[in-house]
């Protein structure tokens, strides 16, 4: 099954390498991995999307919790607040049509010239997949796509933010 896992970690060099190394050693497949600073200085949130059977997901959480810079790990419910970002570059021969598709996906043109147009779209994984399909008619030259960033819904905390005491 597909799971979104959030890890609240100390923001220090090598944390992502340790997390990805753990997945490599255990032969878990990461579908997407994003990370960045949080509102608390010195801490980051890593969001992982994995496709594993239930025992594998439980094992992932247990192994992540053992890593020293990891403070809290949890699987988000099946419907977290989640978004991805895509930047794509297409042929610029039909800029008005490219803009119409961009608008349809609530996107933004970032760069336009006589040869190419570069646009940005944010949204759910499904929306991003649909946008890619829509832009194929303009010969997609390049794509840069983030992984999923996610938080728990409502007032529920995504992660406990107290420091680990060892």
Spans of model-derived segments:
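Long, contiguous binding/interaction regions
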Residues: 1-44, 49-166
């Amino acid at each position: 099954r597909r799971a979104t896992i959030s890890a609240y970690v100390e923001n220090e060099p090598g944390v992502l390498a340790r997390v990805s190394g753990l997945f490599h050693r255990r032969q878990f497949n990461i579908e997407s991995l994003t990370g960045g600073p949080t509102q608390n200085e010195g801490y980051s949130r890593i969001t992982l999307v994995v496709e594993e059977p239930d025992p594998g997901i439980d094992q992932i959480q247990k192994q992540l919790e053992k890593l020293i810079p990891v403070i809290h790990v949890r699987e988000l419910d099946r419907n977290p607040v989640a978004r991805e970002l895509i930047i794509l570059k297409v042929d610029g021969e039909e800029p008005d049509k490219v803009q119409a598709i961009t608008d349809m996906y609530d996107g933004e043109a970032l760069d336009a010239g006589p040869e190419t147009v570069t646009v940005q779209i944010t949204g759910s994984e499904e929306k991003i997949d649909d946008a890619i399909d829509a832009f194929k008619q303009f010969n997609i030259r390049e794509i840069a796509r983030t992984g999923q960033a996610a938080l728990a819904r409502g007032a529920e905390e995504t992660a406990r933010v107290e420091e680990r005491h060892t």
